[in-house]
Amino acid sequence: MYILTNILSIISNDVPTPYALGFQDSATPNQEGILELHDNIMFYLLVILGLVSWMLYTITKTYSKNPLPYKYMKHGQFIEIIWTIFPAVVLLIIAFPSFILLYLCDEVISPAMTVKVIGYQWYWKYEYSDFVNSNGETVEFESYIIPDDLLEEGQLRLLDTDTSVVVPVDTHIRFIVTAADVIHDFAIPSLGIKVDANPGRLNQVSALIQREGVFYGMCSELCGTGHSQMPIKIEVVSLGKYLGWLNEQ
């Protein structure tokens, strides 16, 4: 029974995998919308590829057998209308869902908590500005990559950190992102989050994480020699576990 349960359980892919050609599994409505938009656009592109391939094949196959001397025809108004209107319609079909999703991803909906993210060369600092510890100080900590020689069994190379961001599941979370030195980028693929961290500027993005788990990301803006050593690790837990973790800070 235990083996059957493991087989039937859903195992989500929340980390990069070698030679992967697809996306990581979504954990937020924003990422679900991104995946759906990608699938729709891919469908349109495959239809266009098939149509153009069929036209080229038909033209090359029947051109020599065509009895009509089209070399003296200067223009064809009907076909010119078709190849102007058809691409315009396809672009509109792709553009409208893209614009809607773009604005939805930028919208911050009544956040229940805020996490401030500050990028440094080459680590992240996190501040829970809504909470204070027993000393009356804001809950904050720095997050560094775990070196290869200190990795334990089960930890991921270039992805695991010494401390991780802990947030509750099914909660509207706002990330306020900035940087202290150069431009960084706070990106977690499974959450559909990718926002620039610019010195002197505050950018914000919201997330409603719908399942528990550990989600990994990386700095996605070239920021110097240690750019590849800025992983992001977010642990999503139940509200009870989150409050217990918060009391320990």
UniProtKB/Swiss-Prot annotation:
Any coiled-coil regions, as ranges: none
Subcellular localization, as worded in the UniProt entry: Mitochondrion inner membrane
Main enzyme class: translocase
Disulfide bond positions: none
EC number in record: 7.1.1.9
Transmembrane parts of this sequence: 40-60, 81-101
Superkingdom per UniProt: Eukaryota
Record key words, sorted: Copper, Electron transport, Magnesium, Membrane, Metal-binding, Mitochondrion, Mitochondrion inner membrane, Respiratory chain, Translocase, Transmembrane, Transmembrane helix, Transport
GO cellular component entries: mitochondrial inner membrane
Chain positions recorded as Mg(2+) binding sites: E221
Pfam families: COX2, COX2_TM
GO molecular function, one term: copper ion binding
Needed co-factor(s): Cu cation
Entry-linked NCBIfam families: CoxB
PANTHER family: CYTOCHROME C OXIDASE SUBUNIT 2, CYTOCHROME C OXIDASE, SUBUNIT II
Protein name, per record: Cytochrome c oxidase subunit 2
Organism: Vanderwaltozyma polyspora (strain ATCC 22028 / DSM 70294 / BCRC 21397 / CBS 2163 / NBRC 10782 / NRRL Y-8283 / UCD 57-17) (Kluyveromyces polysporus)
Taxonomy of the source species: Eukaryota, Fungi, Dikarya, Ascomycota, Saccharomycotina
Gene name linked to the record: COX2
